[in-house]
A protein has these predicted regions:
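A charged, aromatic-enriched C-terminal amphipathic alpha-helix characteristic of glycosyltransferases
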Residues: 68, 208-211, 225-257
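Short, small-residue-biased leader/transition segments that mark boundaries at the very start
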Residues: 3-4
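Conserved donor-binding/catalytic core segment of Leloir-type glycosyltransferases
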Residues: 34, 73-91, 97-100
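Donor nucleotide-sugar binding/catalytic pocket of nucleotide-sugar-dependent glycosyltransferases
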Residues: 8, 28-70
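Short hydrophobic beta-strand element within catalytic cores of glycosyltransferases
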Residues: 177-181
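Aromatic "clamp/platform" in nucleotide-sugar-dependent glycosyltransferases that forms part
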Residues: 160
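Membrane-proximal helix-turn-helix segments that form the acceptor-binding/catalytic region
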Residues: 14-33
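Nucleotide-activated donor-binding/catalytic signature segment of Leloir-type glycosyltransferases, i.e.
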Residues: 125-142
Length: 261
């Protein structure tokens, strides 16, 4: 007797997340599936079509929103970069620090502020101290960022994956230029390559830490020396569809569709 164990997705079988598998396997009993991003919706639709020969109704409704766009009261600080996240290993703020240190050689005006706390804080502090970068890289801790984002020119995220990306949404809502990895799902949702910043294609299994930080540094230099001229405007355009009033309309439309189906 042969027993076949499937442990991965292939051309004929998909291994869904355990949290969602029951619902997906019983899709005929579900009125709607809701995803946080359009990319997730597209991916899920393709998977249902390929593996289940099914086309359930899937709608995109973001899991976060912004009340209004935030504009700077005075000119943004030139050559300023920020990030905001938990200082956790998967966020790789240390990579951004290393990249800024590399880019500083070509852009002496560069500054980088880090907002957040977490278990990686001491590691990040040590990198800053080792390279004597305290004058231009600072850890700011937890703050209410509502009036802070718009003081900066550029936001960088270095997560290898992001289900949505609330701080990315808040950053485009304050008009920042954006740099992040071309990975699912947050960065492609908020970054239009060459328009409001750059998506960095990367093979994390093949690339060394030095390769990764060099690529980020290259994009930082590119942004400030020859970057998209309408980056701030494009970010505000992207943010429009994440305003609370728009999200409320999406929920209203969905509820009406369910009630009158």
């Amino acid at each position: 007797r042969r027993v076949l164990f499937r442990s991965a997705t292939d051309g004929t079988h998909i291994l869904w997340n355990n949290y969602y598998e029951y619902q997906f396997e019983n899709a005929q009993h579900i009125d709607f599936f809701i995803t946080a991003t359009d990319l997730q919706r597209q991916t899920l639709s393709e998977q249902f079509k390929q593996y289940k020969n099914d086309c359930p109704r899937i709608r995109t409704i973001p899991v976060g929103s912004i009340e209004s766009l935030q504009y700077p009261e005075k000119e943004r600080k030139p050559y300023s970069i920020m990030t905001a996240s938990r200082l956790a290993n998967e966020k790789h703020v240390d990579w951004i620090v290393e990249a800024v240190i590399k880019a500083k050689h070509q852009l002496p005006q560069l500054s980088f502020d880090i907002y957040g706390q977490g278990e990686e804080q001491e590691k990040i502090k040590n990198i800053i101290t080792k390279h004597r970068a305290e004058d231009y890289i600072q850890i700011k801790g937890h703050r209410n960022l509502r009036t802070i984002y718009q003081q900066y020119e550029l936001f960088i995220a270095a997560s290898q994956s992001e289900g949505f990306g609330l701080t990315l949404m808040e950053a485009v809502g304050s008009g920042l230029g954006m740099i992040g990895f071309d990975v699912n799902y947050g960065s492609p949702t908020f970054i239009r390559h060459h328009q409001n910043g750059y998506l960095i294609p990367i093979d994390f299994e093949q690339a060394s830490t030095d390769d990764i930080t060099t690529q980020i540094a290259h994009m930082i230099i590119r942004y400030f020396e020859d970057g998209p001229i309408r980056a701030h405007e494009v970010s505000y355009d992207i943010a429009e569809s994440f305003k609370t009033s728009h999200i409320v309309d999406l929920w209203r439309q969905l509820i009406e569709e369910v009630l009158y189906d």
